[in-house]
A protein has these predicted regions:
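N-terminal glycine-rich anion-binding loop in soluble enzyme alpha/beta folds
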Residues: 2-57
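Short glycine/serine/threonine/alanine-rich loop segments
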Residues: 23, 61, 179
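Short gly/ser-rich anion-binding loops that grip negatively charged ligand groups
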Residues: 39-43, 65-76, 114-118
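Flexible, charged surface loops at secondary-structure boundaries
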Residues: 1, 57-59, 212-216
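N-terminal glycine-rich phosphate/adenylate-binding segment common to multiple enzyme folds
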Residues: 48-90
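Mixed-charge interfacial surface used for oligomerization/domain docking
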Residues: 10-18, 28-31, 36, 75, ...
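Structural beta-sheet core signal
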Residues: 5-7, 65, 111
Length: 216
Protein backbone atom coordinates (compact mmCIF):
# COMPACT_ATOMS: atom_id res chain seq x y z
CA UNK A 1 0.00 0.00 0.00
CA UNK A 2 1.28 3.50 -0.85
CA UNK A 3 0.14 6.85 0.57
CA UNK A 4 0.36 10.43 -0.71
CA UNK A 5 -0.25 13.29 1.73
CA UNK A 6 -1.78 16.65 0.78
CA UNK A 7 -1.97 19.76 2.95
CA UNK A 8 -2.27 23.53 2.57
CA UNK A 9 0.23 26.34 2.98
CA UNK A 10 -0.92 26.99 6.58
CA UNK A 11 1.34 24.04 7.49
CA UNK A 12 4.38 26.31 6.95
CA UNK A 13 6.58 23.46 5.72
CA UNK A 14 9.82 24.25 3.91
CA UNK A 15 10.38 23.32 0.28
CA UNK A 16 13.16 20.82 1.12
CA UNK A 17 10.85 18.98 3.54
CA UNK A 18 8.00 18.96 1.05
CA UNK A 19 10.26 17.48 -1.62
CA UNK A 20 11.80 14.94 0.74
CA UNK A 21 8.40 13.66 1.92
CA UNK A 22 6.67 14.14 -1.47
CA UNK A 23 3.92 16.21 0.18
CA UNK A 24 1.49 18.07 -2.07
CA UNK A 25 0.61 21.63 -0.94
CA UNK A 26 -2.40 23.73 -1.93
CA UNK A 27 -1.87 27.46 -1.33
CA UNK A 28 -4.10 29.66 0.79
CA UNK A 29 -4.47 33.00 -0.96
CA UNK A 30 -3.56 36.42 0.46
CA UNK A 31 -5.61 39.26 -1.02
CA UNK A 32 -4.10 42.75 -0.82
CA UNK A 33 -6.57 45.64 -0.58
CA UNK A 34 -6.05 48.79 -2.67
CA UNK A 35 -7.36 51.17 0.01
CA UNK A 36 -4.71 50.58 2.63
CA UNK A 37 -6.76 48.02 4.55
CA UNK A 38 -4.91 44.92 5.84
CA UNK A 39 -4.60 41.95 3.51
CA UNK A 40 -7.18 39.19 3.84
CA UNK A 41 -6.96 35.48 3.13
CA UNK A 42 -9.06 33.19 0.97
CA UNK A 43 -9.50 29.42 0.98
CA UNK A 44 -8.33 27.35 -2.00
CA UNK A 45 -10.99 26.75 -4.62
CA UNK A 46 -12.63 23.36 -5.02
CA UNK A 47 -10.89 22.97 -8.38
CA UNK A 48 -7.45 23.67 -6.89
CA UNK A 49 -8.07 20.97 -4.31
CA UNK A 50 -9.39 18.51 -6.91
CA UNK A 51 -6.26 19.08 -8.98
CA UNK A 52 -3.98 18.52 -5.97
CA UNK A 53 -5.79 15.34 -4.93
CA UNK A 54 -5.66 14.07 -8.50
CA UNK A 55 -1.89 14.64 -8.68
CA UNK A 56 -1.48 12.78 -5.40
CA UNK A 57 -3.70 9.93 -6.60
CA UNK A 58 -1.53 9.62 -9.68
CA UNK A 59 1.38 8.34 -7.58
CA UNK A 60 -0.25 6.47 -4.69
CA UNK A 61 -3.04 4.04 -3.92
CA UNK A 62 -4.41 6.17 -1.07
CA UNK A 63 -4.52 9.91 -0.44
CA UNK A 64 -4.69 11.69 2.92
CA UNK A 65 -5.56 15.40 2.97
CA UNK A 66 -4.83 17.22 6.24
CA UNK A 67 -5.95 20.84 6.35
CA UNK A 68 -6.06 23.95 8.51
CA UNK A 69 -8.65 24.03 11.30
CA UNK A 70 -12.25 24.60 10.23
CA UNK A 71 -12.43 27.14 13.08
CA UNK A 72 -10.00 29.35 11.14
CA UNK A 73 -10.80 28.69 7.48
CA UNK A 74 -13.41 27.24 5.19
CA UNK A 75 -10.72 25.18 3.44
CA UNK A 76 -12.02 21.92 4.92
CA UNK A 77 -15.48 22.53 3.43
CA UNK A 78 -14.05 22.88 -0.06
CA UNK A 79 -11.77 19.90 0.60
CA UNK A 80 -14.73 17.64 1.33
CA UNK A 81 -16.52 18.81 -1.80
CA UNK A 82 -13.37 18.20 -3.85
CA UNK A 83 -12.92 14.72 -2.38
CA UNK A 84 -16.52 13.77 -3.17
CA UNK A 85 -16.12 15.01 -6.75
CA UNK A 86 -12.91 13.08 -7.29
CA UNK A 87 -14.24 9.87 -5.77
CA UNK A 88 -17.30 10.10 -8.03
CA UNK A 89 -15.04 10.73 -11.03
CA UNK A 90 -12.91 7.66 -10.29
CA UNK A 91 -15.97 5.47 -9.81
CA UNK A 92 -17.18 6.35 -13.30
CA UNK A 93 -13.69 6.19 -14.87
CA UNK A 94 -12.13 2.98 -13.53
CA UNK A 95 -9.16 3.28 -15.86
CA UNK A 96 -8.23 6.79 -14.73
CA UNK A 97 -4.79 7.86 -13.47
CA UNK A 98 -3.04 6.30 -10.53
CA UNK A 99 -2.17 2.81 -9.30
CA UNK A 100 -5.07 0.35 -9.33
CA UNK A 101 -7.66 3.13 -9.64
CA UNK A 102 -10.41 0.72 -10.55
CA UNK A 103 -9.68 -1.40 -7.47
CA UNK A 104 -9.29 1.36 -4.88
CA UNK A 105 -10.49 0.42 -1.42
CA UNK A 106 -13.35 2.29 0.28
CA UNK A 107 -12.17 5.58 1.79
CA UNK A 108 -9.01 5.62 -0.32
CA UNK A 109 -9.22 9.43 -0.12
CA UNK A 110 -9.52 10.78 3.43
CA UNK A 111 -9.93 14.42 4.43
CA UNK A 112 -8.91 15.38 7.98
CA UNK A 113 -9.74 18.60 9.82
CA UNK A 114 -6.53 19.06 11.81
CA UNK A 115 -8.14 21.45 14.31
CA UNK A 116 -4.92 23.45 14.23
CA UNK A 117 -2.60 25.50 12.04
CA UNK A 118 0.99 26.58 11.34
CA UNK A 119 3.70 24.55 13.11
CA UNK A 120 1.29 22.14 14.79
CA UNK A 121 -0.32 21.40 11.42
CA UNK A 122 3.09 20.95 9.85
CA UNK A 123 4.14 18.44 12.51
CA UNK A 124 0.90 16.50 12.02
CA UNK A 125 1.48 16.36 8.27
CA UNK A 126 5.05 15.16 8.73
CA UNK A 127 3.89 12.46 11.15
CA UNK A 128 1.29 11.24 8.66
CA UNK A 129 3.73 11.21 5.76
CA UNK A 130 5.55 8.24 7.29
CA UNK A 131 2.47 5.99 7.15
CA UNK A 132 1.68 3.41 4.48
CA UNK A 133 -2.09 3.98 4.31
CA UNK A 134 -4.58 6.79 4.92
CA UNK A 135 -6.12 5.28 8.04
CA UNK A 136 -2.78 4.98 9.83
CA UNK A 137 -1.69 8.40 8.57
CA UNK A 138 -4.85 10.02 9.94
CA UNK A 139 -4.28 8.36 13.32
CA UNK A 140 -0.68 9.61 13.45
CA UNK A 141 -1.78 13.14 12.52
CA UNK A 142 -4.46 13.18 15.19
CA UNK A 143 -2.03 11.87 17.81
CA UNK A 144 0.37 14.66 16.89
CA UNK A 145 -2.24 17.42 17.21
CA UNK A 146 -3.45 15.97 20.52
CA UNK A 147 0.05 16.56 21.91
CA UNK A 148 0.26 20.15 20.65
CA UNK A 149 -1.00 23.41 22.11
CA UNK A 150 -0.91 26.76 20.33
CA UNK A 151 -0.73 29.86 22.51
CA UNK A 152 -0.18 33.38 21.19
CA UNK A 153 -0.64 37.11 21.60
CA UNK A 154 -1.22 39.59 18.78
CA UNK A 155 -0.38 43.28 18.37
CA UNK A 156 -3.63 44.20 16.61
CA UNK A 157 -6.82 42.52 17.78
CA UNK A 158 -8.82 44.48 15.22
CA UNK A 159 -7.86 42.06 12.47
CA UNK A 160 -9.12 39.08 14.44
CA UNK A 161 -12.35 40.94 15.24
CA UNK A 162 -12.96 41.90 11.61
CA UNK A 163 -12.61 38.26 10.57
CA UNK A 164 -15.01 37.13 13.32
CA UNK A 165 -12.35 35.13 15.18
CA UNK A 166 -12.73 37.14 18.40
CA UNK A 167 -15.52 39.41 19.63
CA UNK A 168 -15.35 43.15 18.97
CA UNK A 169 -15.65 44.03 22.67
CA UNK A 170 -12.32 42.35 23.39
CA UNK A 171 -10.74 44.21 20.47
CA UNK A 172 -12.07 47.57 21.73
CA UNK A 173 -10.62 46.95 25.20
CA UNK A 174 -7.23 46.50 23.58
CA UNK A 175 -7.52 49.85 21.82
CA UNK A 176 -8.87 51.86 24.77
CA UNK A 177 -7.19 50.30 27.80
CA UNK A 178 -4.22 48.47 26.33
CA UNK A 179 -5.72 45.16 27.43
CA UNK A 180 -4.01 42.20 25.75
CA UNK A 181 -5.44 38.70 25.92
CA UNK A 182 -3.31 35.57 25.95
CA UNK A 183 -5.01 33.40 23.34
CA UNK A 184 -5.17 29.68 22.59
CA UNK A 185 -6.25 27.92 19.41
CA UNK A 186 -8.67 25.09 20.19
CA UNK A 187 -10.85 22.93 17.96
CA UNK A 188 -13.73 25.31 18.68
CA UNK A 189 -11.78 28.41 17.69
CA UNK A 190 -9.68 31.03 19.44
CA UNK A 191 -10.16 31.13 23.21
CA UNK A 192 -8.98 33.78 25.68
CA UNK A 193 -6.95 32.24 28.51
CA UNK A 194 -6.40 35.48 30.42
CA UNK A 195 -6.26 39.22 29.87
CA UNK A 196 -3.48 41.52 31.05
CA UNK A 197 -2.51 45.15 30.49
CA UNK A 198 0.34 45.87 28.13
CA UNK A 199 2.23 43.92 25.49
CA UNK A 200 5.25 43.16 27.69
CA UNK A 201 3.07 41.62 30.42
CA UNK A 202 1.17 39.63 27.79
CA UNK A 203 4.40 38.14 26.48
CA UNK A 204 5.56 37.20 29.98
CA UNK A 205 2.23 35.55 30.73
CA UNK A 206 2.34 33.75 27.39
CA UNK A 207 5.67 32.18 28.35
CA UNK A 208 4.31 31.25 31.78
CA UNK A 209 1.25 29.60 30.19
CA UNK A 210 3.47 27.65 27.79
CA UNK A 211 5.64 26.39 30.65
CA UNK A 212 2.51 25.32 32.56
CA UNK A 213 1.09 23.46 29.57
CA UNK A 214 4.43 21.71 29.02
CA UNK A 215 4.38 20.52 32.61
CA UNK A 216 7.24 22.74 33.78
Amino acid sequence: MSLAVVTDSAACLTEPLLRERAIEVVPLHAIAADNGEPATTSRPSVQELVDAYRRAAGRAEEVLAIHISSALSGTIDNARIAAAQLEAEYRTQPNGPGPSVGRRRPQWLRVVDSGTSSGALGLAVLAASGAHDARRGAALAQASTARSCQLFVVDDLGRLARSGRIDRTTARLDGVLGIRPVLALTRDGIRTLETVRGAARARRDLIAQAVRVAGG
